[in-house]
Swiss-Prot record:
The gene is CATSPERZ. It comes from Homo sapiens. The lineage of its organism: Eukaryota, Metazoa, Chordata, Craniata, Vertebrata. This is Cation channel sperm-associated auxiliary subunit zeta. Residues 1-31, 58-78 are annotated as: Disordered. Component of the CatSper complex or CatSpermasome composed of the core pore-forming members CATSPER1, CATSPER2, CATSPER3 and CATSPER4 as well as auxiliary members CATSPERB, CATSPERG, CATSPERD, CATSPERE, CATSPERZ, C2CD6/CATSPERT, TMEM249, TMEM262 and EFCAB9. HSPA1 may be an additional auxiliary complex member. The core complex members CATSPER1, CATSPER2, CATSPER3 and CATSPER4 form a heterotetrameric channel. Its main location: membrane.
Length: 200
């Protein structure tokens, strides 16, 4: 059973070079796609597909996709498979397609259940949010440091920046723009610190 699909895939790869062929260029492809939408599986190919007779031969040779090498491939396939086997092959493909469509339906049900779960969790989080402070306020409260620790960190930062300023003044000069920029930054930190200390 696994050999048949591999033969079909080999033959379909041989046909891919033709620019003029249509999407439904193969009788087997037409049979498979039409039987998926038909209630009766034993309809003759001539009733289902235009351009084919009762035996599955192409009636219209004017399509331009039939080539001399192609005829030998089709004849080899027809010689190796009887019409009953073709029907069995179509039934196997139909079953495979039904299985994959059922998997798709199951996947849709899974996504629907996930959406429902997300809705219920978001509703419960809305109920919790009514009783809790705003998220931004909560994040600010969590990131706020105690005042003595903040003062300690500011003192260490000012000490490090002052040492860097001295090395800049000695290394690159007092008139360099990086030295002036660092000096302005340190003065700004000192002003903010003094304002906060005088307010408290």
């Amino acid at each position: 059973m696994e050999e048949k699909p591999s033969k079909v895939s080999l033959k379909s790869s041989d046909r891919q070079g033709s620019d003029e062929e249509s999407v439904h260029s193969d009788t087997r492809d037409l049979w498979t796609t039409t039987t998926l939408s038909q209630a009766q599986l034993n309809m003759p190919l001539s009733e289902v597909c235009e351009g084919f007779d009762e035996e599955g031969r192409n009636i219209s040779k004017t399509r331009g996709w039939h080539s001399p090498g192609r005829g030998s491939l089709d004849e080899g396939y027809k010689a190796s498979h009887k019409p009953e086997e073709l029907d069995e092959h179509a039934l196997v493909e139909l079953e495979l397609h039904r299985g994959s469509s059922m998997e798709i339906n199951l996947g849709e049900k899974d996504t629907a259940s996930q959406i429902e779960a997300e809705k219920s969790s978001s509703m419960s989080s809305l109920n919790i949010a009514k009783h809790m402070p705003h998220r931004a306020y909560w994040a600010e409260q969590q990131s706020r440091l105690p005042l003595p620790l903040m003062e300690l960190m500011e003192n260490e930062a000012l000490e490090i920046l002052t040492k860097a300023l001295r090395s800049y003044q000695l290394g690159i000069g007092r008139d360099h723009f990086l030295t002036k920029e660092l000096q302005r930054y340190i003065e700004g930190l000192k002003k903010r610190r003094s304002k906060r200390l005088y307010v408290n």
